[in-house]
Amino acid sequence: MGRYSGHGGTHTKKKQYKRARSTKNRAKDIDQIFDEIQPETIDKFSKFEVDPDLPGMGQNYCIHCSKHFVTNEDLQSHIKGKPHKIRVKELKTKPYSLAESQIPVDNGVKLNRDANGVPTTTDVTGTIKKSTTTTTTTTTV
């Protein structure tokens, strides 16, 4: 089906405003929250001073979801909810880190060629073996 007349274009101006709103209201990433809930840093991030700019004066805070709530009842109902339980489940596993991304991948046997162009294989142990592939020709009379 085609588009209706008068609805041309991609509405890029709306996309700009949506992008600005989404980046302004962006929540913390899993790896940042994982670092905050470690035993050595949990005291620093779990206690807040009274701040009139935050909801509930900054006293009702869910450390797993990184959200402030207006009342303690709102916090308790949030803890019983599904989004909180999903976030806690995600935080049980260690997040993917930069160091893990830089580990080289070992896929087993690697095929290299020597100076003559003959394929040689290198084992996982590092020993080099020459491949012994021979070609046979058959003649038909």
UniProtKB/Swiss-Prot annotation:
InterPro entries: C2H2-ZF_Maturation_Protein (IPR051879), Matrin/U1-like-C_Znf_C2H2 (IPR003604), Znf_C2H2_jaz (IPR022755), Znf_C2H2_sf (IPR036236), Znf_C2H2_type (IPR013087). One of its GO terms (cellular component) is cytoplasm. GO terms for molecular function: nucleic acid binding; zinc ion binding. Gene3D superfamilies: Classic Zinc Finger. The keyword Cytoplasm applies. Signal peptide: none annotated. GO terms for biological process: ribosome biogenesis. It comes from the Eukaryota. A zinc finger (C2H2-type) spans 60-84. Residues 1-32 are annotated as: Disordered. Keywords: Cytoplasm, Metal-binding, Nucleus, Ribosome biogenesis, Zinc, Zinc-finger. It is found in: Nucleus; Cytoplasm. Residues 10-25 have a biased composition (Basic residues). Pfam families: zf-C2H2_jaz. Involved in pre-60S ribosomal particles maturation by promoting the nuclear export of the 60S ribosome. Associates with pre-60S ribosomal particles; released from the pre-60S particle very early in the cytoplasm. Belongs to the ZNF593/BUD20 C2H2-type zinc-finger protein family. This is Zinc finger protein 593 homolog.
